[in-house]
């Protein structure tokens, strides 16, 4: 059992199941990936297989190992706003949330850029920002420091402290 506000790190060799665990918690297994599940996965007291994906997405934010696999837009601002756009927020609230997110994460220099022109580390930052903008209770980060240089890893550490301070589960 992982409690609210807890910070958990899964370590292990390649292929041991770390990504599989994240896919179970964010509902991709069994809804998108086939597999045989023995046991139950509960999020917020509910069995994950019984929760619609849109409800899971409101509670669980995922940053994938390869950030390109989660992008839906070409420019960074649209990508950061994408998840909250699906919540039908008014345009001015979207703009405010994108601004607040980029300020909180100190990534203003990445605003209004073409995603395909970003470095791997910058793409990782935008992927994290798109999840942060949605303000989920649970963050699932699959190899979040991949593609990051040492300075960016330090920045990620500060971002994780920020969400931990907000009482989020990581």
Predicted regions and their residues:
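Conserved ABC ATPase "signature" region
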Residues: 92-110
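Conserved ABC ATPase signature
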Residues: 114-118, 122
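Conserved ABC transporter NBD signature motif
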Residues: 34-46
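Helix N-cap at the start of a conserved alpha-helix in ABC-type nucleotide-binding domains
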Residues: 150-152
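Conserved catalytic motifs of ABC-family nucleotide-binding domains
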Residues: 135
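Catalytic Walker B motif of ABC-type/P-loop ATPase nucleotide-binding domains
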Residues: 139-142
């Amino acid at each position: 059992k992982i409690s609210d506000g807890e910070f958990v790190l899964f370590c292990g060799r390649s292929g041991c199941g770390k990504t599989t665990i994240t896919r179970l918690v964010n509902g991709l297994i069994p809804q998108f990936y086939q597999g045989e599940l023995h046991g139950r996965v509960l999020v917020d007291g509910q069995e994950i297989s019984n929760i619609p994906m849109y409800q899971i997405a409101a509670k669980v934010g995922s940053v994938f190992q390869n950030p390109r696999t989660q992008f839906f837009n070409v420019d960074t601002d649209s990508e950061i706003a994408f998840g909250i756009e699906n919540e039908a927020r008014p345009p001015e609230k979207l703009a405010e949330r994108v601004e607040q997110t980029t300020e909180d994460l100190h990534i203003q220099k990445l605003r209004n850029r073409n995603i395909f022109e970003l470095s791997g580390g910058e793409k990782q930052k935008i992927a994290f920002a798109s999840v942060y903008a949605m303000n989920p209770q649970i963050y699932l980060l699959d190899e979040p420091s991949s593609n990051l240089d040492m300075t960016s890893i330090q920045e990620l550490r500060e971002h994780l402290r920020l969400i931990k301070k907000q009482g989020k589960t990581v």
